[in-house]
Amino acid sequence: MSHSAGPGAAQPATAAAPRQRTPWITRVGRVFRFAAQRADEEKLLQVASSLTFTTVLGIVPMLAVVLSLFTAFPVFQDFRLALEDFLANSLMPPAVSDNIMDYLNQFAYQASRLTAIGGAFLVVTSLLLIMTIDKTFNDIWHVTRQRPLPQRALVYWAVVTLGPVVAGASLWATSFLARESLGLVRDVPEIVSLAISFLPLILTGLGFAALFVVVPNRHVYWRDALVGGFGTAIVLELMKAAFAYYLTRFPTYTVIYGAFATLPIFLLWIYLSWLAVLFGATVAASAPLIRLGRWEINRSPGAPFIDALAVLRALHAAQGMRPAGRSASALAKRLHLHHDELNAVLEKLENLGLAARTAEQRWILACDPRSTTLEPVFDNFLLDRHQPRLRDDPQVVQAAAAVLGQDGGQAPTLEELAGLAHNTPVGLAAIVPLEAGKNSRRGPHAPGESSC
């Protein structure tokens, strides 16, 4: 194939030069800076404070429900001991873990002696704590549509009843296997001992990853959840070591509060723990953007309009497919859009009657593409031509039409905007008439109204 000799032909080496890869440590730093920026946008410091208060009110009722469940079935006694040991040794600073677990067990024992009405109140309080956590995670993932109430009730019930049993069984089995392996083998290899010492960290990371997958009302990839889950587990371990060092070297709270020091230390630890969990959730929610190589949501003016046209084209191309339509994940991957961007566009297209969601949670075109104009898309995503200010000032509409249809020419000047000159709309304006007083043959479309 021959090429004309142009300015670019004299430097073939430059054109073929491979793009330099960014060092991995730089990429990791950018990821954490981006996650920190997202954490600031989500106001995680304030959210952690709110969750700390809610946890203090709900942890005793939750623990009472869990302990009553373990007490009702003696076969679960070993599971309970394994769960308590894990909470004390893996999720709390060693300096205060024994005191905190003693207090929590005393409170839970007293609460378990309540009447049926009191027990129902405990269950409701526990569910309120879970609902708060559910709302917080959905806010981090920018979920606008909650699960149906029966589905949420099923998830909450599973978390309250099955969650502690599964966690206790897993921890008991892990500790049992570790003890048996150490008993059968006298000289345990150092690498095996090291692996066993990391089991609590691995279980914590897997637990948080499962939480990030199950709680948000959105499809979360396991690879993203695992990154956030193990990030949370590592941060918790580092915080626990730093917190224990601070309490032993600088016993400020003990000097000031004396025997009462356990309470403020416990509150501070809950707050720091929620910060770690929320930061891990933010990392998991930001992972799709990071994989796309983008470091922010595209908030450029007009970007939703371009995204809406791309979505409509993708849904049009999917007509006739079996199963019908495309899933949100497939659309996001095909169009290189973040789920937040895509969901905002899909919800607006659904309200316009241009797209619809099937029972299989797939998106299809909900209108006749041969007779549907782009007017409602233009009005709702770019410029509402029916707003009163545009009817009162037609020069603005004409100037916008000229800018959209300039096709490489010169944009209108301020004098032309003032009415000294008029431009004829071409290009996109021919598809979507921009004069507010001139609509299609089918009549004007109000914002939010589909022409299907």
From Swiss-Prot:
Q: Where in the cell is it found?
A: Cell inner membrane
A single GO cellular-component term from the record reads: plasma membrane
Q: Which domain of life is it from?
A: Bacteria
InterPro entries referenced in this protein's UniProt entry, alphabetically: UPF0761_bac, Virul_fac_BrkB
Q: Does the keyword Lipoprotein apply?
A: no
Q: How does it sit in the membrane?
A: Multi-pass membrane protein
Give the primary localization class.
Answer: membrane
Membrane-spanning segments: 56-76, 114-134, 153-173, 195-215, 225-245, 259-279
Q: Pfam families from the entry?
A: Virul_fac_BrkB
Q: Per UniProt, which keywords does this protein have?
A: Cell inner membrane, Cell membrane, Membrane, Transmembrane, Transmembrane helix
Q: Does the keyword Membrane apply?
A: yes
**Family assignment?**
Belongs to the UPF0761 family.
Against PANTHER family, the record matches this protein to: INNER MEMBRANE PROTEIN YHJD, UPF0761 MEMBRANE PROTEIN YIHY
According to UniProt, the name of this protein is: UPF0761 membrane protein Bpet3042
Species this chain originates from: Bordetella petrii (strain ATCC BAA-461 / DSM 12804 / CCUG 43448)
